[in-house]
Amino acid sequence: MKYLKILIIVTIFFFLLINVINCIDRKEIVQKEVKIKFKNLKSTLIKKYSESNMEKIQKHLKHILVERVADTPNHKKVREYIISQFDQLYWDIELDSFKDNTPFGEKTFTNIIVTSKFVNDDDEDDIDTKESNGNISSEPPKTLVLSAHYDSKYFKEFKFFGATDSAVPCSMLIDLAISLQSEIKKSKKKLMIIFFDGEEAFKEWSDTDSLYGSRHLANLLLDKKVITKDNEDLPISSSFYNTVEAFILLDLLGTPNPRFYMFNKKTESLFKKLSDIEDKLSLKRFISPKANKYFQNHFIGSDIQDDHIPFLNYVPTLHIIPYPFPNVWHTEKDDESCLDKNTIEDLSKIFKIFVGSYLI
């Protein structure tokens, strides 16, 4: 009996110790500040990324701009189309599939996670990176995360296509990834693109009926490790979240004259970078004349619920969403007819130059 008590006490001690260690490890990734240094793109690349690309985006929209409520046949077709657009020579594709309870019963959700590869790198989780002096760096490659949701909201009363919400953002991200493949191939940094499932509520928005995919993936990535090697070829494990420099979410894009504001002081420098790129492209007349500036250099408090929320405590987040929302939001008018080609092209150019400046 005496030994049994000792065994129980020792077991409880080790259980508590492990939990304390886990808490310490998780606290290390909370409240990160953005410290990204962007490089200036050559004029040839700026011109390349400023070329008209609406035809390519429309090609993607043709496949995505359908009713695509989570766990339906159309939804599966859209998922398969998105996956098919990423060349596996350049990208690793992971699917995060899981089941969750909804007001309409148990549903299956699938997040799509696409991550750029290094040249001749077959294993993302076992990476060697060389410094200029020839030594192997023990630092894992830094990662920029871009994201949007690919499901559409269920409405009993009408067919909802969700052009801005978020067929256009998904199409823009696919086009961006393909356009930047040559820069991605040479970059020492990683680009991760996440297509979230289950952003929309099936009935009324709540903590349990919304953000199904992002809530699941945010917790899953807490345990993800990136393995690098030191100069003695010994493995070093780092938390995935410690490698993420910023998490950017696109939503409700495509209607004319959107205005974007800063919602998060921690990513103010990223927002200002987008604003500066817009100004430079406007001066060069690479984007269309417009009534107002897209990226307004003003901070406003926001409690907008979206797929960035589950990641707030782990990585710096930048939420790119018009404020106020487009007047077609969650109506049957959020279809192809509400879209403005000039606005979509302009934003696409700005995002490409932003990401290109990060990768080089």
UniProtKB/Swiss-Prot annotation:
Pfam families: Peptidase_M28 (PF04389). It catalyses: N-terminal L-glutaminyl-[peptide] = N-terminal 5-oxo-L-prolyl-[peptide] + NH4(+). Zn(2+) binds at D165, E200, H330. Glycans are attached at N135. Its EC number is 2.3.2.5. GO terms for molecular function: glutaminyl-peptide cyclotransferase activity; zinc ion binding. Responsible for the biosynthesis of pyroglutamyl peptides. Has a bias against acidic and tryptophan residues adjacent to the N-terminal glutaminyl residue and a lack of importance of chain length after the second residue. Also catalyzes N-terminal pyroglutamate formation. This is Glutaminyl-peptide cyclotransferase. It comes from Dictyostelium discoideum (Social amoeba).
